[in-house]
UniProtKB/Swiss-Prot annotation:
Compartments it resides in: Cell membrane
PROSITE patterns (UniProt xref): ABC_TRANSPORTER_1 (PS00211), ABC_TRANSPORTER_2 (PS50893), PSTB (PS51238)
Upper classification of the organism: Bacteria, Bacillati, Bacillota, Bacilli, Lactobacillales
One cellular-component annotation, GO: plasma membrane
Gene that this polypeptide is encoded by: pstB1
Source organism of the structure: Latilactobacillus sakei subsp. sakei (strain 23K)
InterPro entries: AAA+_ATPase (IPR003593), ABC_transporter-like_ATP-bd (IPR003439), ABC_transporter-like_CS (IPR017871), P-loop_NTPase (IPR027417), PstB-like (IPR005670)
Protein name as annotated: Phosphate import ATP-binding protein PstB 1
Main location: membrane
Residue ranges of every copy of the ABC transporter domain listed in the record: 23-264
Gene Ontology biological-process entries: phosphate ion transmembrane transport
Binding annotation for ATP: 55-62
Length: 269
């Protein structure tokens, strides 16, 4: 792999965004023990847009994504410095209630991880944990979120069946429905379609495009075609650095950084 000058970056600040900034980071650093895995990442995420995080394996994109709702807190000997700004609050502060913050910034993981419960209970579990007992409200949330996740028509007559009986693609859409049941502002997605077949992947992509009408979405993907199809903005990561951030169409046609050009053209990664 070529050596790149990591001091040269092209991070396009959204000084006049079409929509407000939903989430941003300022000089974000992540350390695993003595290893620095993320270097001074400063990015902005526009509300009601999909931003793709791309880069080779080990580039830091998933580390960065997990930082956005402090999932890295669960990893031993991990330290995060810098600011993560949400609603004018630095959610990287020790004073922030992490669990309450995650109600606003939800996450969907790479592999479907439904609970060993019914389809209905998968979606209502967190709501019930927060004290919601109104059956009518819970029923409405189940129907609404399953429709948003393009799953309602397939499961509306089997809501009491185990979620584990669903196909992989259906399970992932259930996990999306479960994530939005808490009505978050932001959805973080770590390669949500990488374990799915092409038809299921297409369905998930169509679902995400619809969901951005109501949610801000940040997605890690290794699939360049997927990033080009569904995202409005793209951030390119290399060796723990966010090197380039721009509108997706510009990133894929006129990248400013040599490393980004090599990656999107398939010369490495």
């Amino acid at each position: 792999m070529a050596d790149y000058d990591l001091t040269k970056t092209h991070i396009k600040k959204l000084a006049e965004p079409k929509h407000e900034i939903a989430l941003s980071t300022e000089d974000l650093n992540v350390y695993y023990g003595d290893k620095r895995a993320m270097h001074d990442a400063s990015l902005q995420f526009e509300r009601y847009r999909i931003t793709a995080l791309i880069g080779a394996s080990g580039s830091g994109k998933s580390t960065y994504l997990r930082s956005l709702n402090r999932m890295n807190d669960n990893i031993a000997n991990t330290r995060v410095t810098g600011k993560i700004m949400y609603r004018d609050v630095d959610i990287n502060s020790d004073e922030v209630d992490v669990y309450k913050m995650r109600e606003h910034i939800g996450m969907v993981f790479q592999r479907p991880n439904p609970f060993a419960k019914s389809i209905y209970d998968n979606i209502t579990f967190a709501l019930k944990q927060h004290g919601q007992k109104d059956k009518k409200y819970l029923d409405e949330i189940v129907e609404t979120t399953l429709k948003q996740a393009a799953l309602w028509d397939q499961v509306k007559d089997s809501l009491n069946k185990s979620a584990l009986a669903l196909s992989g693609g259906q399970q992932q859409r259930l996990c999306i429905a479960r994530a939005i049941a808490m009505k978050p502002d932001i959805l973080l997605m770590d390669e949500p379609a990488s374990a799915l077949d092409p038809i299921s992947t297409n369905t998930v992509e169509e679902t995400l495009i619809r969901l951005k009408e109501q949610y801000t979405i940040v997605i890690v993907t290794h699939n360049m075609q997927q990033a080009a199809r569904i995202s409005d903005y793209t951030a390119f990561f290399h060796s723990g650095h966010a090197l380039e951030f721009d509108e997706t169409r510009k990133m894929f046609t006129r990248p400013k950084i040599k490393a980004a050009e090599d990656y999107v053209s398939g010369h490495f990664g």
